[in-house]
Amino acid sequence: MQFDTIELAIEALRNGESIIVVDDEDRENEGDLVAVTEWMDDNTINFMAKEGRGLICAPIDKSIAERLKLQSMEQNNTDIYGTHFTVSIDHYKTTTGISAHERTQTARALIDENTNPEDFHRPGHLFPLIAKENGVLTRNGHTEAAVDLARLTGAQPAGVICEIMNDDGTMAKGEDLQSFKERHHLKMITIKSLVAFRKAVELNVNLKAKVKMPTDFGHFDMYGFTTDYSDEEIVAIVKGDLKSNPNVRMHSACLTGDIFHSQRCDCGAQLEASMKYIDEHGGMIIYLPQEGRGIGLINKLRAYELIEKGYDTVTANLALGFDEDLRDYHVAAEILKYFDISEINLLSNNPKKFEGLEDYGIEIVDRIELIVPETQYNHSYMETKKNKMGHLI
């Protein structure tokens, strides 16, 4: 499939057009027609009903639902993707409520600040959906994508969506969506690209605390951050001037190595070496909650069980159903942007960290190698990192 940029999609939506939004392959893997309520007209709903053929819904921000007292359709939501339907509605000025014009009228009433809860008949023929707070950064659904896209166009946080079905009633996927796009001259994007766009242009980290932190390796300033879209807590320790190409280490948390000094890995030794380097040369360490390359502590211990049976660190992850590395570095990039940093010297042997930061607009000026001694217990682990994961060691 050929996808368009988010910028082109935003422009099309502002012009009152519908676009196609495709979700992830491991989710519904389907395409929805999406339009912004503020910019759409009767033709939008008619096109969705005639060509899309799916259920026409109206994604809205939680604040709209609360203001208009739109209650959940079902208190015990058992939908496999957690789609948050409210009771269906018709605006009181409609007749049957089903025509394209009347569904447009109902959708437009949702974003009219003069609309009152009593202005809707319930049930009706339009199905509002409540988007999760923080949108696609919290849930990778078409509901959240529609509301996020509406905001990005400068409109009220509301849209209309409709699943795309083939002529035979099956769901359009892959080449079917590509043909639909070409036939109707529509822009098409992925939710994944919308997530990346938002992460690249928005600052979603919040400083919650700053303290002096004396350590065995020197005296640092420690900053505590949270994010808008998860319950993660991230710390950064800083020393010296950060203005010109600061030295930065992104360190993934490793309880076994950092705290218990496990010799199965080189994590604890790398953290200590990084702290010594930053103490001497200045810079920052961003400590990320990415235990076990993102699989979590217990799963890392399960991977160790497999390693004891002859697996390596990569094949163990794969055997447990994970990719070899689940880490993403957008939070680190956002923390750097919080400090107005766009160019760094990176303390790392891992090329994926370079790529991960560059994907979010951070330029790597120089690499500072971080070589620590092997132990008798981590030789195989180090060889796997070098030979299978491309680490520069």
Swiss-Prot record:
The EC number(s) given in the record are 4.1.99.12, 3.5.4.25
Q: Where is the catalytic site?
A: 325, 327
Q: Which reaction does it catalyse?
A: D-ribulose 5-phosphate = (2S)-2-hydroxy-3-oxobutyl phosphate + formate + H(+); GTP + 4 H2O = 2,5-diamino-6-hydroxy-4-(5-phosphoribosylamino)-pyrimidine + formate + 2 phosphate + 3 H(+)
Say which domain of life the source belongs to: Bacteria
Annotated Gene Ontology cellular components are:
cytosol
Matches recorded under InterPro entries? DHBP_synth_RibB-like_a/b_dom (IPR017945), DHBP_synthase_RibB (IPR000422), GTP_cyclohydro_II (IPR032677), RibA (IPR000926), RibA-like_sf (IPR036144), Riboflavin_synth_RibBA (IPR016299)
- Binding-site positions, D-ribulose 5-phosphate: 27-28, 32, 139-143, 163
Keywords noted in UniProt: GTP-binding, Hydrolase, Lyase, Magnesium, Manganese, Metal-binding, Multifunctional enzyme, Nucleotide-binding, Riboflavin biosynthesis, Zinc
The residues annotated as site (Essential for DHBP synthase activity) are 125, 163
Residue positions annotated to bind GTP are 249-253, 270, 291-293, 313, 348, 353
Q: Its Gene Ontology molecular function terms?
A: 3,4-dihydroxy-2-butanone-4-phosphate synthase activity; GTP binding; GTP cyclohydrolase II activity; magnesium ion binding; manganese ion binding; zinc ion binding
Give residues annotated as binding Mg(2+) 2: 28, 142
Checking CDD domains in the record gives: GTP_cyclohydro2 (cd00641)
Example GO BP: riboflavin biosynthetic process
Pfam families, sorted: DHBP_synthase, GTP_cyclohydro2
Hey, which pathway is this one from? Answer: Cofactor biosynthesis; riboflavin biosynthesis; 2-hydroxy-3-oxobutyl phosphate from D-ribulose 5-phosphate: step 1/1; Cofactor biosynthesis; riboflavin biosynthesis; 5-amino-6-(D-ribitylamino)uracil from GTP: step 1/4
Q: Where is this region: DHBP synthase?
A: 1-200
Q: Which family does it belong to?
A: In the N-terminal section; belongs to the DHBP synthase family.
Name of the protein in its database record = Riboflavin biosynthesis protein RibBA
According to its UniProt entry, this protein's organism is Staphylococcus epidermidis (strain ATCC 12228 / FDA PCI 1200)
Name of the gene = ribBA
